[in-house]
Amino acid sequence: MANTKKKPVTREAICSALRSSAEDYLRRVAKAHPSETMYAFLLEISCEGFSVHGAVATEEALGRHSQNQLEKVRPIRTPDPLATLRSCLRWAGPEDGWYQQPDTAFDPVNRLLSRAETEALYEMYDGSLHELCIQTLRAMDEALDRDEMTQ
């Protein structure tokens, strides 16, 4: 019988899977909401550091959420109450008007993170996943900048 032992998980493998998952998730959101304008993308991680998901904010979702909230709050005394509320809610918690899970895009990286936990690649709560996410987002941002420069 062939040896089926898997290679240990590496930080590089996690970064690669993070990027693939993030790009897959962004494509899925764009396909589901083709006429919407994204203004933010974030990676939400567990405090323990062994799971990750994405969230996307769009101008249109912010508008819908703001309008919905405007109908629920006391009158806002500004020249443009909706604009004031949009400004307040733009960077509110990602549960408010952002597109989030459930989505299977992050399943591959979460399987790797589960293995990383089992293999004790890093300590729980040590910030390693946070650093890997920052590294991945920077690489994605650099790639986006390069793409924009060639257009």
Regions found by a protein language model. Name each.
Residues 27, 58, 143-147:
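Soluble, non-membrane globular domain cores that form compact, hydrophobic packing
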Residues 8, 80-151:
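Low-complexity intrinsically disordered segments
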Residues 2-38, 42:
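Short N-terminal edge-element motif at the start of the domain
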Residues 32-71:
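N-terminal interaction modules that seed assembly of large macromolecular complexes
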Residues 16, 20-21, 35, 46, ...:
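Generic serine detector
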